[in-house]
């Protein structure tokens, strides 16, 4: 479950007294998400989401995340907008946790995205990058390339335990990533979402209606954000009983890239780097999943995601030599 910190009625009432939102009419925990405690809140003024940031979140990063969403909202980009308290501050404290109230975003997250939704998502991602072009905040990518080798050291046996031969496959991927790092460092950079999976995007029908969960946002290559989306939107299960059997849906990937380029055309260097960026983003999620898979105790409330899903992506990307391989 996603609610790690329980909020009493008395604590909620005292917290809301610091806002001009009226009294609570409805308040319930939200099951989605694994990083923070999230609640649906309805007051006489409207619908909101209340988030309590758990200890795994670096409190020093919270002003950056809040400022980012305020910036996007000021540009008219659809995302949850932080609500200011009577003291003019968005970040407050509830149940000994940093907490923030944001506006409610209409829409649903797609379970099986369509090609039209992928195109609309690509457009939305590019519009986000343009809207953030003049955002002054800066945050290093804590899960970027400089962290991957450290995350991998000592994990070879864990990889072999879930799939024989996987250690050698990962090492081969590292060789290719390392060869491309110097080139990738010169790509256009800016503020990226870095985690725009289907459960972090909302749609009204086939149309993208907004993005949520910016708590991995950072400063990095813009095309890396596109690579994250290709990994999370354009692969489908080839075998429902075998997580290692995934297939790249060329139509969805092509639609996503086309949607992005209709708003922000990729530079030649970004197109050339796309295979390496896709491989790198797959490595990032493989390593975090492998770590969770190996360290989460049996019977834990939060079930870790299978790293083999991203091992399959690594194997796919190693075979791709150009952006055309993704439908660009």
From Swiss-Prot:
Coiled coil: none
Catalysis: reaction(s): L-homoserine + ATP = O-phospho-L-homoserine + ADP + H(+)
Name of one Pfam family that matches: APH
GO biological process: threonine biosynthetic process
Domain of life: Bacteria
UniProt family annotation: Belongs to the pseudomonas-type ThrB family.
Record keywords: Amino-acid biosynthesis, ATP-binding, Kinase, Nucleotide-binding, Threonine biosynthesis, Transferase
Stated name of the protein: Homoserine kinase
EC number: 2.7.1.39
């Amino acid at each position: 479950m996603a609610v790690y910190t329980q909020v009493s009625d008395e604590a909620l009432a005292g917290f809301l007294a610091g806002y001009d939102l009226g009294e609570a009419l409805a308040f319930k925990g939200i099951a989605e998400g694994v990083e923070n405690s999230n609640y649906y809140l309805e007051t006489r003024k409207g619908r909101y989401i209340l988030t309590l940031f758990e200890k795994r979140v670096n409190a020093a990063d919270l002003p950056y995340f809040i400022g980012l969403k305020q910036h996007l909202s000021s540009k008219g980009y659809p995302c949850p907008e932080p609500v200011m308290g009577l003291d003019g501050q968005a970040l407050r404290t509830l149940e000994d946790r940093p907490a923030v109230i944001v506006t409610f975003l209409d829409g649903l997250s797609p379970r099986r995205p369509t090609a039209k939704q992928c195109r609309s998502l690509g457009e939305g991602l590019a519009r986000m990058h343009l809207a953030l072009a003049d955002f002054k905040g800066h945050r290093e990518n804590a899960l970027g390339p400089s962290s991957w080798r450290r995350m991998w050291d000592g994990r070879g046996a864990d990889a072999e335990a879930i799939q024989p031969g996987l250690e050698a496959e990962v090492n081969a991927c590292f060789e290719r990533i390392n060869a491309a790092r110097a080139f990738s460092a010169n790509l256009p950079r800016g503020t990226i979402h870095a985690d725009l999976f289907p459960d972090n995007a909302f749609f009204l029908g086939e149309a993208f209606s907004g993005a949520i969960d910016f708590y991995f946002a950072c400063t990095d290559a813009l095309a890396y954000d596109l690579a994250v989306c290709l990994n999370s939107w354009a692969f489908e299960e080839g075998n429902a009983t075998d997580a290692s059997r995934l297939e790249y849906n060329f139509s969805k990937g092509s639609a996503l890239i086309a949607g992005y380029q209709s708003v922000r055309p990729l530079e030649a260097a970004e197109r050339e780097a796309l295979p390496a960026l896709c491989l790198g983003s797959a490595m990032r999620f493989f390593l975090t999943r492998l770590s969770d898979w190996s360290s989460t105790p049996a019977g834990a409330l939060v079930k870790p995601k299978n790293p083999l899903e991203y091992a399959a992506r690594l194997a796919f990307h190693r075979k791709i030599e150009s952006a055309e391989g993704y439908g660009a």
